[in-house]
Each structure stands twice: as C-alpha cells, then as structure tokens.
C-alpha cells in the first residue's frame, strides 16, 4: 500500500470512534463538531490547497443567493468549470493539488450541486404555494428553509464521507442533526454486520495486487507473454481494484453507521443517496423509537455481491458507488439532451469521466459502457425471450461471464490512465470486447431486437430472481 492509501485508511478508521462520540450529541454539537473534524482533516491532508474547497463553496452559495430559482444549473456549471481549472493548475504554473484535495473536491462538487437543487425545489414549491393561495403539507424531502452560509459550510466540511463518500443530500444531513431519540437508533450491531467482510477483502487486495502488480502491464516484457496470459491479467487487476474499493466504502459506511448517520425506519423505504421515498412520521417517544426497525440504505455505497454476481452491465453500474450513481441518475441522466436510453447513458458516462478527471483512460473506459449497454440490450431483446427456462438460465450465466470480462477490460483504462498504455494493452488483446460488443449489437439489430429505451428488458422484472439463482449455485 502507498502512503496515500494508508492515510485514507486512517481517516476512514478514525471516523468510526468519532461517529460514536457524535451519535447522541445535540444538533449544535453535531453540526459544528462534525464540521470542525472535517475541516481539521481537510487542512491536515490538503494544507493550503484547502482554499479550493472554500472558493467552490462560496461561489455556490453566492449563486444560490442570487438566483434561487435556477441555481441548480448554475451550480452545476460553476462546480464543473472549477474542476477544469482545478485540474489545469499545473499547466498554468500553479501548485498542483494533493490527491486528498482532489478527493475532497470531487465529493464537494456532488454535495453543492445537490444542495443547489434542493434549494431550487424549495423556492419553486414556495412560489407554487403563494400562487395557489393555500398551505399544503411539505413535500417529502423538501428543506424547511434556505441554509445560511455557515450552515452551508458545516454541511460541506462535515467529516462524514468527506474524502471517500458516501454522498448524501443536505436533507439527509439535516435529518441526522435533528434525529429524535438517537440513542434508540442501532449502531453497533449494524456496524459489525457491515464490517465483517472488510478484513477478508483487505487481505485479498494485498495478495492480488502483490501477485499481479499493475506496473507489469506498463513494461515491454509483458507484451512478450502469450495471448492467454495477457487476456487473463486483466481479471486479477480488476479483482484487486474491486477489493480495494470494497474495503474503503465499507469502512466509510461504518463511519456513518457509528454516528447513526443516514438511519431511517425501514418503512421509509430509503434509497442509496436519495433517502426516504415514503413519508414516515418521526417517533414521539423513546419507546416508539426503540420499537422501530431501521436501516442504513441511504448511505449504502456498495453492494459487493450485486457487483460481482448481477447478470447485466446495466445492473453492475447500479451496485457500484451507489450514492454517486443516484446523483448521476438524478442530476445528469434525467436532464440529458437525448431521449434514447443509450445516448442518455453515453452523456452520463461522459460527464462521469470528466468528474473523475482528465486522464484519457477514464474516457476510453466510460465511453465503452454505452456500447456494451446497447449490445446487451438489443441482443437480449431479440433472443432471450425465445429460449426455454433452461436456455434462459444458461443465457444468464454466459451473460454474467461476459459482463465480468467487459468490466475487467474497461477497468484497465481506468487504472492505466494514459491513452498510450490503455490502447497498447487493449491492442495486445485485439480490442476483443469492442469487437464482440459490435457483433452482438449488429446481430441484435438484424434479429429485430428492441431499443433499450423503448422496451422492457425480459430479465428486468426478474433480475433479483436471477441474482438469487446465481447465489444458490
């Protein structure tokens, strides 16, 4: 592990005992104590580069104050434009930010765009109420008022997920501050249930990254190896990549769980990133609060089993970095300037690549996803429904195998970063995923498969059952 990885791990582990300290605190101590810890971590790891986060926050707050009815689009433009400046600092002869500064900036961008959207929703709801002339019950998830500058700063610098996620909305943050009877919200048992696989994943990461180092792919000697070896190598590289993020995100979730952050009654049917989808009145007494069943779906960032064993490329995205996937779906996919599912996905993947950075490998990887989505969608629509139950089961196993190989292939661009290294590796295995995806897409079109945006995927309604079948076997 690199020194940076050790620092990330220490930050994640420290957040767990800190969470237990804040869990039963009052709203004021939670707000300002959590912000002080987060600001301290930012200053410690980023130093003077912390100024970038402050500039981004102040700029967003100014836009919210100036144009509350359109601040969402303005905040998106501002924060994404600042990301470009932030990443071009070395080209401008300015000090290059640390990797920790980049991590803080990435999560801060998501939070501020979401905050602007929540403020815009509040402003539009207030205008609608004034126009109608009567008071209505507040909409689920609506903010009670526009946050002040200090409240915006406290949300932005809250230590929870400050470098690794999970992403959370201001409404989720506010619910944590005002959580009734926090002592009734379970933390220790959910934390232990969530944390138990992390040590195993950590050991698997250390073992796989040691046996199959990524740096080997950048050496000339690697390309003298036989084709089967080159093909196989992407599998352990992606495996190590997954194990690394599994550990990081599970630890980050445990930090939230320790603080009771993102806990809602199961009846609220909370979604990762978005929070509750059903209105659930707060408990009126400690006894009622203790009788409720809670979950932490709002801050769930990774479904390890779903990532590894879901059947389709499309589903694989949903189980990975789940809170960020919600953000992308809510603020990018829904407002994409296209109607086609594949084109909307391409637009979303393009902006996701930009959010991650300017390395060409990000774009090569992310822009391969829409091709895979189109290929699996058209071919599945054309063929799978005509198969027998046994044939569909075999189809799903083959589909799962190819889905995993596609992600292995795309991961190489994400970790190699440069265009030269990525294309060199892909060329050494003859761009086989691209060619296979094009062949499947062509076959699906010839056989009359429907567009993914205009049909219901035959396995969509039974995706959970298919996943269970894979689990059983």
Curated annotation (Swiss-Prot):
Organism, scientific name: Mus musculus
Primary residence: endoplasmic reticulum
Q: What does this protein do?
A: Acyltransferase which catalyzes the transfer of an acyl group from an acyl-CoA to a lysophosphatidylinositol (1-acylglycerophosphatidylinositol or LPI) leading to the production of a phosphatidylinositol (1,2-diacyl-sn-glycero-3-phosphoinositol or PI) and participates in the reacylation step of the phospholipid remodeling pathway also known as the Lands cycle. Prefers arachidonoyl-CoA as the acyl donor, thus contributing to the regulation of free levels arachidonic acid in cell.
Please report the record's description of how this protein sits within the membrane.
Multi-pass membrane protein
Q: In which pathway does it act?
A: Lipid metabolism; phospholipid metabolism
Q: Which family does it belong to?
A: Belongs to the membrane-bound acyltransferase family.
Reactions catalysed, semicolon-separated, are: a 1-acyl-sn-glycero-3-phospho-(1D-myo-inositol) + an acyl-CoA = a 1,2-diacyl-sn-glycero-3-phospho-(1D-myo-inositol) + CoA; 1-octadecanoyl-sn-glycero-3-phospho-(1D-myo-inositol) + (5Z,8Z,11Z,14Z)-eicosatetraenoyl-CoA = 1-octadecanoyl-2-(5Z,8Z,11Z,14Z-eicosatetraenoyl)-sn-glycero-3-phospho-(1D-myo-inositol) + CoA; a 1-acyl-sn-glycero-3-phospho-(1D-myo-inositol) + (5Z,8Z,11Z,14Z)-eicosatetraenoyl-CoA = a 1-acyl-2-(5Z,8Z,11Z,14Z-eicosatetraenoyl)-sn-glycero-3-phospho-(1D-myo-inositol) + CoA; (5Z,8Z,11Z,14Z)-eicosatetraenoyl-CoA + 1-hexadecanoyl-sn-glycero-3-phosphocholine = 1-hexadecanoyl-2-(5Z,8Z,11Z,14Z-eicosatetraenoyl)-sn-glycero-3-phosphocholine + CoA
Q: What is its EC number?
A: 2.3.1.-
**What spans does the record annotate as topological domain Lumenal, numbered to this chain?**
23-33, 94-194, 262-426
Q: Does the keyword Transcription regulation apply?
A: no
Cytoplasmic side residue ranges read 1-5, 58-73, 213-231, 448-473
Its name, as the record gives it, is Membrane-bound acylglycerophosphatidylinositol O-acyltransferase MBOAT7
Which BP terms from GO are recorded?
layer formation in cerebral cortex; phosphatidylcholine acyl-chain remodeling; phosphatidylinositol acyl-chain remodeling; phosphatidylinositol biosynthetic process; phosphatidylinositol metabolic process; regulation of triglyceride metabolic process; ventricular system development
Compartments, record wording: Endoplasmic reticulum membrane
Give the enzyme class. transferase
Any one annotated GO CC term: mitochondria-associated endoplasmic reticulum membrane contact site
Q: GO molecular function: any one?
A: O-acyltransferase activity
Any stretches that span the bilayer, and where are they? 6-22, 34-57, 74-93, 195-212, 232-261, 427-447
Give the keywords, sorted. Acyltransferase, Endoplasmic reticulum, Glycoprotein, Lipid biosynthesis, Lipid metabolism, Membrane, Phospholipid biosynthesis, Phospholipid metabolism, Transferase, Transmembrane, Transmembrane helix
- Entry keyword annotation includes Membrane: yes
Region annotation (Disordered) ranges = 451-473
> What happens biologically when this protein's gene is inactivated, per the record?
Knockout mice die within a month and show atrophy of the cerebral cortex and hippocampus. Embryos at 18.5 dpc have a forebrain smaller in size and show disordered cortical lamination and delayed neuronal migration in the cortex. Mice with conditional knockout in hepatocyte develop hepatic steatosis spontaneously, and hepatic fibrosis on high fat diet feeding.
Subunit relationships: Interacts with SPTSSA; the interaction facilitates MBOAT7 location to mitochondria-associated membranes (MAMs).
